[in-house]
Amino acid sequence: MLEVADLEVSYGAVKVVRGVSFRVAEGEIVLLMGPNGAGKSTIAMTIAGLLRPDAGTIRFRGESLAGPAHHVLRRGLSMVAEVRRICPLQTVEDNLLLGAFIHRHDRRRVVDAMTEVQELFPVLGAKRRALASTLSGGEQQMLAVGQALMARPRLLICDEPSLGLSPRLAQELFTRLERINREGVSVLLLEQRVSIALPIARRGYVIETGRIVLEGTRSELGRDPRVIESYLGGVREDVRAASDGAARVA
């Protein structure tokens, strides 16, 4: 579905993504993990068309996102940015409708998408008339995901979706992402909280200083000493705090 090959991106004279290649197949959740400053957000923004790469190719559903049809192709993907892009003085419902408006959906598709999002996140339905500014941090993050889903994407890119959330709320959000995936949406998950994120991924990649340094299945990465030491050892409090005990590495 998504194929990134030899991607290079710079900010001025500073190279921040260096020859990165990875793929997300139809129906997969793929985790791209790494520390702050590794280049994860830059990769997400480049795929979404917000940054121009220096080199490399990005193909979505077999077509180049640098080609003449890239605007149409990008309607099939949505991104939940690290910084929430919601309007605090608009209602929850209006924020959701904004996600559909950007992708120019017809009324029937908007109604269907609204129903699906409110079933996935009941709190958004219950608070649809409330201002977004009155929501808790966890609810605002669910609103950001719901807004992205209003586009009814084939691929959902989530950049640090658990940022600022408690372990319990992060686990709840990832459980929702699993459900979204079961309903046919592929997910590219960019995260630091590997102890909670890795269990829902089929495969993963480790990125450091702009390069992919390790890749493998969930089980392979969960057993790798480098991942255990660098990405699992420091966040075991998250694992212990998960309310349902589901945050385990297979």
Language-model segment annotations:
Residues 33-35:
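The feature captures the beta-strand-to-loop junction immediately N-terminal to the Walker
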Residues 148-149:
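ABC ATPase C-loop
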Residues 131-135:
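Conserved ABC ATPase signature
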Residues 48:
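Helix-to-loop junction immediately C-terminal to a conserved catalytic motif
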Residues 57-73, 219:
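ABC ATPase NBD Q-loop/coupling interface
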Residues 156-160:
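Catalytic Walker B motif of ABC-type/P-loop ATPase nucleotide-binding domains
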Residues 12, 92-112, 120-125, 216, ...:
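ABC-type ATPase nucleotide-binding domains, specifically the catalytic core motifs of the NBD
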